[in-house]
């Protein structure tokens, strides 16, 4: 931890003023080094009051996706987020983790912006600087491939729970994994799997999550403006990205523990409650082209695939790699 981070940590732990002498003594720094650290923190956007005879007091922190800011809100986790790296810019947080040979289970990476963010079906994911949470987590579950299809759905439930904890509003889930608010997409989730060439065993999973936090309508490209939203648009106020990121890491840690334990009953119940498609007539749009079909979404099965009832009254299961689901009149409705 740098001297700047050490000073910040002590200031966070005090409700009132902390003298320069106390900071110097507790950190083993000179008074000049303490002043230099405070000056550097102010340069990063921290509002620090200084009073003669009293010392320093932290008044406000900037909305920065730094390790220090995220960890200031983060409770201890078992696996997810114990290793955390934060960057100003990456081409893709998923790409970074896929290239990290030997990265530990649960390692997490964030970026203030991405130049080549991606969503499902290799679609572009817009990642403007300072407006969202762009997070990827590396998982090494050591499970057979047939135990892993629920991962993305579990991440969707984790996002909904984290947003509810921090913002007081719970998103719904458009099958299979899009958190939505007011009928518009709030978040994108992409899971990528790496297999061992010789054995076909799962080497790792990279789970990428992008949450729209501070975007205004004009910040979205015209082609996604009608289907995308942000927490700012829904709530009418700014949300702390570090605080929400910390809550998300905690919820992902719980979901990962449930996956490893093989007990997903609570997550299936939450997913069924959150899924905005259940009980509604939807459009099934085949990937790769083909005729659209209208059916009624009636259930979610053990692997979080969608059970639909066609016009002939027969029920069947559709999987996320086969079709995209839309409402009759819009993204969800």
What are these regions (language model features)?
Residues 107, 170-174:
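A short coil-to-beta-strand element that immediately follows conserved catalytic motifs
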Residues 1-30, 39, 43-44, 143-171, ...:
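Long, positively charged amphipathic alpha-helical accessory segments at protein N-termini or as interdomain linkers
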Residues 50-52, 174, 300-301:
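Short, ordered beta-strand-loop transition motifs
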Residues 2-165, 185-187, 239:
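N-terminal lobe of the biotin/lipoate ligase/transferase fold
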């Amino acid at each position: 931890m740098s001297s700047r981070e050490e000073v910040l940590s002590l200031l966070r732990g005090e409700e009132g003023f902390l003298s320069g002498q106390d900071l110097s003594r507790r950190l083993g720094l000179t008074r000049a080094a303490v002043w230099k650290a405070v000056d550097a923190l102010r340069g990063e956007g921290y509002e620090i009051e200084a009073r003669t005879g009293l010392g320093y007091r932290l008044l406000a922190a900037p909305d920065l996706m730094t390790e220090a800011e995220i960890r200031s809100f983060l409770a201890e986790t078992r696996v997810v987020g114990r290793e955390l790296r934060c960057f100003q810019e990456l081409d893709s947080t998923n790409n970074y983790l896929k290239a990290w040979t030997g990265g530990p289970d649960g390692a997490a990476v964030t970026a203030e912006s991405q130049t080549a963010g991606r969503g499902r079906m290799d679609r572009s994911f817009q990642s403007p600087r300072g407006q969202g949470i762009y997070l990827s987590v590396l998982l090494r579950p050591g499970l057979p491939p047939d135990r892993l299809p629920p991962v993305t759905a579990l991440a969707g439930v984790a996002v909904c729970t984290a947003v509810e904890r921090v913002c007081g509003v719970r998103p719904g889930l458009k099958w299979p994994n899009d958190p939505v608010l007011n009928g518009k997409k709030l978040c994108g989730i992409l899971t990528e799997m790496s297999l061992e060439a010789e054995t076909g065993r799962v080497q790792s999973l990279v789970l990428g999550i992008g949450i729209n936090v501070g975007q205004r309508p004009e910040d979205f490209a015209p082609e996604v403006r009608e289907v995308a939203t942000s927490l700012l648009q829904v709530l009418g106020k700014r949300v702390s990205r570090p605080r929400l990121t910390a809550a998300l890491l905690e919820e992902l840690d719980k979901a990962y523990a449930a996956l490893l334990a093989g007990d997903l009953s609570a997550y299936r119940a939450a997913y069924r409650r959150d899924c905005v498609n259940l009980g509604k007539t939807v459009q099934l749009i085949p990937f790769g082209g083909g005729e659209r079909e209208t059916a009624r979404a009636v259930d979610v099965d053990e692997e979080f695939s969608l059970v639909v009832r066609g016009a002939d009254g027969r029920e069947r299961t559709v999987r996320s790699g086969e079709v995209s689901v839309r409402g009759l009149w819009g993204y969800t409705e």
